[in-house]
């Protein structure tokens, strides 16, 4: 359970932003989306390799 302490006089918008940040860090939504459909392990590995190559290319261009 995510708990966000709200200080006296603190803006609700700020507290909501903290909650959203903590919620995203837990990865619940990402996990739920990934579990909606089964992917074969071979497909998962292939996608992971493709992402790694893409990120590596971006880093090379950045340097």
Curated annotation (Swiss-Prot):
Single Gene Ontology BP annotation: translation
Example GO molecular function: structural constituent of ribosome
Gene3D superfamilies in alphabetical order: Ribosomal protein S8
A cellular component annotation (GO) from this entry: ribonucleoprotein complex
UniProtKB keywords: Ribonucleoprotein, Ribosomal protein
Pfam families xref list: Ribosomal_S21
Family the entry assigns: Belongs to the bacterial ribosomal protein bS21 family.
Name under which the protein is recorded: Small ribosomal subunit protein bS21
